[in-house]
Regions:
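Bacterial Sec-exported substrate-binding components of ABC uptake systems
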Residues: 20-73, 176-206, 274-280, 326-332
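Bacterial N-terminal signal peptides that target proteins for export
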Residues: 1-9
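A short, structured surface patch at a secondary-structure boundary
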Residues: 69-123, 127
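Structured C-terminal subdomain patch of bacterial secreted/periplasmic proteins
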Residues: 46, 264-332
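Basic- and aromatic-lined ligand-binding clefts that recognize polyanionic substrates
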Residues: 70-83, 179-239
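Proline-aspartate-enriched helix->loop->beta-strand connector
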Residues: 117, 124-130, 147, 257-260, ...
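Extracytoplasmic substrate-binding proteins
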Residues: 138-213, 311-332
Length: 332
């Protein structure tokens, strides 16, 4: 089940802990960098029916109305909405907080494990979009309701994801604009990092789960790992590399207070798991190992919210990059 990791994140027993005032980093309280704004695209397709046949990612031929607005999307809602489309309903786990304009008139499915056929049917869709790793047996169930097209889900290649969506709906102009935005965002972010003097530095993202730990990055988990290490080309120190590559240990394995210093990077960020609180909890601040870190003594720990980084979709990219740079600026 490809949404399991995402669901685990939201179902984790997060302890809401009181904390003192802390230097935090959200997109609302730090200096804005010269990063591009997310373009607002509209759906300019005709209302006339336009039948089209394509071969899907799983090799099936599907005939559908390429101009339909009657769509139910079981995955990748952020990419779909970014393109200018407004489905009837989308995956209920999609993050809409702060993106209400995109979700106006769009309902969220209540049943997402992986779906309730009756609920999907209730929307009377002409087309169903789903993630490309859905089991064929589930796709077969959906095909009894409407044509089904799997779309790219489990990849950071936004060009592949967005161009494929643009091809499905003949919205190449919109997909080209969106891809250009993503390219510009990456390029300007790299340039901004160099201006801050952090090129080739090491970065460590700490969090708390039954102990101070480092969030996993296997199977593309958490977008901040991709941005920091793959796009911005920052590095992990040797101990962080060993920790993240150790598949034998459980995710979020606690790091002992005595060894925590060994994981400190040139840049250090704390990933808050509390959706409503971007501060470092007391259970972390009172940890002797944490208090011994140079970055903590110098009050140079940036904070991000881990929930923002649970989805790869283009809709969230601008805020994800801004949040990371706000956190990095705290460490200056």
């Amino acid at each position: 089940m490809n949404f399991i990791f995402k669901k685990v994140l939201f179902l984790l027993p997060i302890i809401i802990l009181s904390s003192c005032n802390e230097v935090t980093s959200t997109s609302n309280n730090s200096t804005k960098l010269d990063l591009p704004k997310m373009p607002t695209l509209v759906d300019n397709r005709s209302n006339d029916k336009k039948m089209k046949t394509i071969t899907t990612l799983n090799g099936n031929e599907v005939t559908y109305n390429a101009n339909t607005r009657d769509i139910v999307a079981l995955g990748c809602a952020g990419d779909i909405l970014s393109l200018g489309l407004r489905p009837l309903a989308v995956d209920g786990n999609t993050n809409s907080n702060g993106y209400e304009n995109y979700f106006y008139g769009v309902e969220k499915l209540k049943n997402t494990q992986p779906f309730d056929p009756e609920e999907v049917l209730s929307y009377k869709p002409e087309l169903i979009l789903t993630y490309d790793t859905m089991d064929q047996k589930d796709i077969t169930k959906l095909e009894k309701i409407a044509p089904v097209i799997p779309i790219y889900f489990n990849t950071y290649d936004y060009e592949k994801r967005i161009s494929y969506l643009g091809n499905i709906f003949d919205m190449k102009d919109n997909s080209d604009i969106l891809i250009s935005f993503c390219h510009e965002l990456e390029e300007k972010s790299l340039a901004s990092l160099e201006k801050l003097g952090f090129k080739n530095k090491t970065v460590t993202v700490f969090s708390y789960m039954n102990g101070i730990c480092i969030p996993p990055d296997f199977n593309g988990a958490f977008v901040f790992n991709h941005i920091l290490y793959d796009v911005l080309n920052l590095n992990k120190n040797e101990k962080v590399e060993q920790y993240l590559n150790n598949q034998a240990q459980p995710a979020y394995s606690p790091i002992s207070s005595e060894k925590l210093k060994e994981y400190e990077g040139d840049i250090n960020i704390y990933a808050s798991m509390d959706e409503t609180d971007n501060s470092i909890p007391d259970v972390v601040k009172t940890n002797e190992g944490w208090k011994s870190l140079k970055c903590v003594k110098g009050n140079k720990v940036g904070v991000i919210n881990i929930v923002l980084f649970s989805l790869k979709d283009v809709l969230y990219m601008a805020n994800q990059y801004q949040s990371i740079f706000n956190a990095i600026e705290v460490t200056l």
